Amino acid sequence: MANKTPKFLIGIDLGTTNTVVAYADMAKALSPENCKIFEIEQLVAPGEVAKRPQLPSFRYHPAKGELKENDLLLPWSDKLNDDLPTIVIGELARELGAKVDGRQVVSAKSWLSHPQVDRSASILPWGAADEVSKVSPVLASASYLFHVRQAWNTSHPDALMEHQEVVITIPASFDESARAFTVEAAKRAGLSEILLLEEPQAVCYDWYARQGNHAQAQLAKIKLLLVCDVGGGTTDLSLIKISKAKDDSLALTRIGVGNHLMLGGDNVDLALAHTVEQKINGDRPAKKLSTSSLSQLIQQTRKAKEKLLGNNPPENTKVTLLGSGARLIGGAKSYLLQQQEVSDIALDGFFPVININEQPVKRRSAVVEFGLPYAPDPAVSKYLAQFILEHQSACHDAINSTQPEEIATPDALLLNGGVFNSPALNERAQKVLSEWKTGNITLLENSRPDLAVAQGAVAYAKARRGAQLKIGGGSARTFFLALEKTDSGQQAICLMPKGAEEEQEFMLKEQKFSLRLDQPVKFHL
């Protein structure tokens, strides 16, 4: 029988492109070394199960008879309630989706934060044919967490995941509805007691834990840190003030959070897909790709991007656009994507070197053909500039500026997200920030940006137990309760101010409330 007393601290990075799990054994000292990546069992080929450090956040809905029952066997037999009877999750789902048109669910995390759709409705795969079974963004997210939970429980039958302390990370820019849908997905996956942590903070926790006793010395001359987390579907920005407490100990306080920005590696993949489509068609008039065909092409351009922007890249790699229907193979067309083309799009299109006063282009709508409301301007650099300018008051305060007429900029940068596995993009982001600052900007080392968030979630759980420094800053937003309109207009009561710390209570002693009996009421926050 499983012990319900927590034995492990578990951090889950529920990513747009990959899900990662890290953990620490509570029976051991909660030192930085006490943190491991949990390798997740998953299908990697039909009938073949293997452990991987990441679970690709992809689902594949096979056609009837496409895969044999034995091809889909996992080390566990439990199924997620209300899910489809036949699905593939993880590496095999990613590979099948790159070959078969219109049956892959991608970017479920981005859909969780899409306010213009019903996130509980069965809409994914987006744009798929009527005969393809669909699921909601909430259920898709729950299925990844359920898979992770089953893999963990199979490996730890005496310490089930639902009985451990679990921290799930989310973008700092997630609004309350997106956070609530994440909690709902976790509950549907069997994880009813979880903690949420903002991803940029998780990155900071991981960095601090890895530096150990050297952290204080490395941050001694730094006053303002920018955390730039560019994932598959979102860009997450946070400002961290670094100061000394009264006892001369280090104090880290989050002082700024960026708006929700649906701009990330997926956008690069989409731009590359359009480039390949145009090159293949040449001057011939071509029918616009269906959503499902575009999805299949994007999976291939994603792989090409990672190869051509990685270490020791080849000069080119082949990308194939499959035909459809009876012409699936015969109608296939290929293009040799050059390393320089990818570099031009990823660096100059998404991380151009600009003046800090250059603002993002504002349009009525962004790239929405793939279903998601992408940011209207593809240049991450411009949103970085906008974010820093919008937080000038906090920036000046953090660096103790005596020249308010000058633009205050961060003096340190911490990069995260799979995008920054590319040395070229890493260097470009640093160059962009350096152009805005007199003197060099300090780049804090992050050797595994694909694992840092999950590891940071574990470090946060340790910090809650006093094992390391805890980042302050509290709530990123102020919460008001809207009251009924009066002759003097709309009024509201502040329930929780921005900066409120975890478990801090606020008593509304001066406010009297009236009760309305036997009538339905709504509370507008």
Question: What do these predicted regions represent?
Answer:
Residues 1-7, 196-228, 399-404, 451-470:
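Conserved phosphate-binding catalytic cores of ATP/NTP-utilizing and phosphoryl-transfer enzymes
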Residues 2-32, 103, 108, 119, ...:
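Gly/Thr-rich phosphate-binding beta-strand-loop-beta motif of the actin/hexokinase/Hsp70
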Residues 143-159, 206-216, 349-409, 428, ...:
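Phosphate/ATP-binding catalytic cores across multiple sugar-kinase/actin-like superfamilies
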Residues 189-202, 373, 429-456:
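Conserved phosphate-binding/catalytic loops in two-lobed NTP-binding clefts
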